[in-house]
Every structure is written in C-alpha cells, then in structure tokens.
Amino acid sequence: MARQKFERKKPHVNIGTIGHVDHGKTTLTAAITMAMAARGGGKGKKYDDIDSAPEEKQRGITINTAHVEYETEKRHYAHVDCPGHADYVKNMITGAAQMDGAILVVSGADGPMPQTKEHILLAKQVGVPNVVVFLNKEDQVDDAELLELVELEVRETLDNYEFPGDEIPIVPGSALLALQALSENPEITPGQNPWVDKIFKLMDTVDAYIPTPERDTEKPFLMAVEDVFSITGRGTVATGRVERGSVKVGETIEIVGLRETRTTTVTGLEMFQKTLEESVAGDNVGVLLRGIQKIDIQRGMVLAKPGSITPHTKFTAQVYILTRDEGGRHTPFFAGYRPQFYVRTTDVTGKIETFRTDDDQPTQMVMPGDRIKMEVELIQPIAIEKGMRFAIREGGRTVGAGVVSAIVL
C-alpha cells in the first residue's frame, strides 16, 4: 500500500504531556486522540497502543517515547508521551521531543506532587515556552472547594518556577471517564457526554493559548560547518546543513567560533551539484565564501547572520549523565573533570567547574544516572546560545547529554 502523503494544510505544533506518575498522562493522551478522531482529525489510539512505547535512540541514549498525531480544527499536532519518569527527564534534556507547549496533568484528588514540580522545573530549564493544565480525576473529588484549593496550589507552583500562574488556563475533567465514553461510542459528538466535552474544551484551550511557534525558516540564518574545501579559481566552500533561517547569494554573513569572528560575502550556493539563489532551513548546502582561505575556516565554526550569535566559553547547563547500562561511565567524576563537549559538529574540551544537584545543593561528586546543573568552561570559544543541546563525550563515547541554561561569559 502506498504511503499517504503528508499534507500541510494546517500549522504544525509539537506538544507533550508532563506530570507526576499515575496522574493520568497516558490516559489523557489516549482520550485526546480518540476525541479528535471523533471530530474527524486523525486516528484514535487506545491506551495500550501508547503505553507500549517504542525505544528511541537520541545522542546515544535510549528513551521510550510514544509519538501520536491528531488534528484539531485549527492545527496538526504531534504529541509525545513518555511512560517512565526517567524517560521524561532524558527526553526533555536531549531534545528527542522539542515541545512548543505542554499539557501538565495534575490529579485533582492529590494536587501537585514531587514529579509535578520536577517536570515544571525541567520544562522551564529546557525552554518549553507554554503550559496548559489539565486537572484530572475531577470525578474523584466530591467537594468543589477542594478542587479550587488544588487549582490555587497548581497556580502557586507554576508561579514559583516563573510560569505565569495566574494566566495559565486550567481545565478540569476526567481522562478515564472520557476515554470510557469514547471507547463505547467512537463517533461521539460535542454535547453528548460531559466528560468528552471537557477533552474538546481542553484542546480548544490548547489551540487558543499555545501560540504557533516561529518556524526555523523565519529565524536568523545559521549553518554549522561540517566540511571545507577549496575550488581552484572560485574560492573556499563550506558545507553543512542549514539549521535555521535562509541565506541568499550576495548576502553578508559571519564566521563564528574557535577563532576571531570574521565577516564575508556569500558568492555562491550549491546543492546536489546545482546552483541556488537561496538556501533555507533543512538544506544540505555548499556555501562559496569570498576572500576566505581554506585554512581560515574549519568544522565546528558556524556561518550566521551578522550579530545573531556570539562565541562564548562559559555557560551553565542542565545535564543527564548516562548510566553504565546506557553505555556511560562506570565510575563517578568530580569537579575539574575535563571531557569533550560535542556541540553541533565538533568536540571542544571543557572543564566542569562546579556541580549542583537538582534541588540546588552544591555537590562534589556525580554518579552515572544523575541529573545535575553544571558550570562549564571551554578551552576555545564557540557559538553557543541558551536552549542549545550538546553531548558530553569521553574517548569517543557519549557519557552525558545537556542543554544550555544560561551563558556566563
């Protein structure tokens, strides 16, 4: 059977469910896919289809994630749900699923729990921009005042982690009762079941509150250099994949990282042996540069729109250290450890100055499997920005993965 063509009729948004274990994330994901299928947008998935998440490998780390897709009237969504807590942590740090927004699931019967807070903190640190709350298990709360208290507590918790707690929409409901109703009648329409209506309401809220993200083509141009060669009589060509934005022949760009930043002009663009006038995000392209010698440019530098990115040596990051079973280290390490930081296309040696645990306590020793904050100083400046992902490597193998939380220097 021929594959269906993916048609881009609606804007695409990446979303995920986050929250404490057993508060109903996977049940909600199943209820959403079935409710949207009932409205005519996609194919419903049952709980078991989502819960048996396939393993994915991202930067050498195995993560169980389930991706489902569905459509609302306004958008096409790709939705990620991770079964295990450790998978969430790894997923968010490695960016296996970069979320444009998240649905935070909180049980109305229990209120915010430790992992609720951990996921909110993580969402903040890895740059999930917007959150909508689903207050689940409403059917288990007899007292309306109790539900209001839980709602206040959720808003307060969000405020503590610098999300706009007062503005964030909170939709109460019961994922389980909605899912049961949808399983009995997969073609249910709005107005037939109050619990299913709450799922429709949740998705209308997500449509309205989570903005359509700026796509990579609209951002300032950036391409990490993968290879460099010279063409006699024409000059130097840098090849790589355009990470974001677009570039045209004749435009001025900067070469950033590893050495002094230099400015040059794009004199030609080539892809698959054909010349282009313009290259956009996602293209694998050769960029011909005016007045640049082959020795002036190397793998690990980036070509970028002037002023859009600067080289740095010091940053803080949120990092997950692989366990022995995941192919990571067998032994702990200490402050002063000097691994390689693999950023975009190159390894740069860096020294880990300090560590802090997740609850912000200073610590001296880091064990495989830990999640920590660290401050790093690289021996060479490279183009770094907040929210950028990297791998930590030692002797060619990945021992950790991280995301830049802040630039220090």
Curated annotation (Swiss-Prot):
Its main location: plastid. It catalyses: GTP + H2O = GDP + phosphate + H(+). GTP binds at residues 19-26, 81-85, 136-139. PROSITE patterns: G_TR_1, G_TR_2. Mg(2+) binds at residue 26. GO terms for cellular component: chloroplast; mitochondrion. Residues 60-64 are annotated as: G2. Coiled coil: none annotated. Residues 19-26 are annotated as: G1. SUPFAM superfamilies: EF-Tu/eEF-1alpha/eIF2-gamma C-terminal domain, P-loop containing nucleoside triphosphate hydrolases, Translation proteins. The keyword Magnesium applies. InterPro entries: EF-Tu_GTP-bd, EF-Tu_GTPase, EFTu-like_2, EFTU_2, G_TR_CS, P-loop_NTPase, Small_GTP-bd, T_Tr_GTP-bd_dom. Keywords: Chloroplast, Elongation factor, GTP-binding, Hydrolase, Magnesium, Metal-binding, Nucleotide-binding, Plastid, Protein biosynthesis. One of its GO terms (molecular function) is translation elongation factor activity. It comes from the Eukaryota. Its EC number is 3.6.5.3. Residues 136-139 are annotated as: G4. PANTHER family: ELONGATION FACTOR TU, CHLOROPLASTIC (PTHR43721:SF5), ELONGATION FACTOR TU-RELATED (PTHR43721). GTP hydrolase that promotes the GTP-dependent binding of aminoacyl-tRNA to the A-site of ribosomes during protein biosynthesis. This is Elongation factor Tu, chloroplastic. It comes from Pleurastrum terricola (Filamentous green alga). The lineage of its organism: Eukaryota, Viridiplantae, Chlorophyta, core chlorophytes, Chlorophyceae.
